[in-house]
């Protein structure tokens, strides 16, 4: 199987969307036909059937998804609404959303040799959920969707790095506040430590991923981040 699965992960406000967009631009410059799964799910409130993506060579994806379980997560479960869903329920919801995404889109696309550029994934559950509540890493990794994702780990994992203080500043400047429960400074500091940990890197390397870090702290510009992301990807392609 071609090594064409790239996952971009990191704290909120760390530039993940910029990096994925850079990979999308790269694909378009290579005359690769791109299917934007996020836009499709927003517009149709469902995942595409396999035949609907046959004519495309690259998929732009993200977690949480933008339909079904993903919408329940975005609009209800992880919002600040004082309904306080348990960490177990939250973890199961993320796992189910992931299981559907992988079975319906990611795995079939990779088997067909398509590129997959995805924002967030199983690494987010591993980083965030033990910080959010009383749940062990072992329990998280045993959930079916999470097991499936680890069995189909990305070939290249780009972790975007930024200081927690910068994250809070960036999030406060966003036009659309998503009201997620994760946007607290102490929470972000703990998240940063986990993303930068050696054990996390070792975990994904043991599942076949190449792990690369991309610093997006000021004064790095959007253009510089995009350029560095493409260089990381092209260097990976050259060696694989």
Regions found by a protein language model. Give the residues of each.
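Hydrophobic positions on the alpha1 helix immediately C-terminal to the Walker A/P-loop
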Residues: 19
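NTP-dependent small-molecule kinase module
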Residues: 22-26, 30, 165-240
């Amino acid at each position: 199987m071609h090594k064409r699965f790239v996952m971009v992960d990191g704290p909120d406000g760390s530039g993940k969307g910029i990096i994925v967009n850079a990979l999308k631009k790269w694909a378009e410059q290579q005359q690769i036909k791109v299917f934007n799964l996020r836009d499709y799910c927003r517009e149709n409130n469902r995942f595409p059937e396999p035949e609907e993506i046959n004519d495309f060579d690259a998929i732009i994806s993200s977690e949480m998804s933008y339909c079904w379980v993903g919408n329940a997560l975005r609009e209800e479960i992880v919002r600040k609404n004082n309904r306080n869903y348990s960490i177990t329920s939250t973890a199961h919801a993320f796992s189910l959303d992931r299981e559907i995404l992988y079975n319906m889109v990611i795995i079939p696309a990779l088997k067909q040799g398509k590129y997959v550029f995805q924002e967030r994934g199983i690494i987010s559950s591993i980083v965030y959920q033990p910080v959010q509540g009383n749940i062990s890493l072992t329990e998280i990794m045993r959930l079916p969707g999470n097991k499936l994702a680890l069995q189909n780990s990305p070939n290249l994992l780009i972790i975007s790095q930024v200081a927690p203080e910068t994250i809070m500043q960036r999030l406060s400047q966003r036009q659309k506040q998503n009201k997620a429960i994760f946007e607290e400074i102490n929470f972000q500091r703990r998240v940063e430590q986990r993303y930068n940990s050696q054990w996390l890197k070792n975990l994904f390397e043991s599942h076949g991923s190449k792990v690369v870090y991309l610093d997006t702290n000021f004064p790095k510009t959007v253009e510089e981040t995009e350029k560095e992301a493409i260089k990381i990807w092209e260097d990976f392609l050259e060696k694989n």
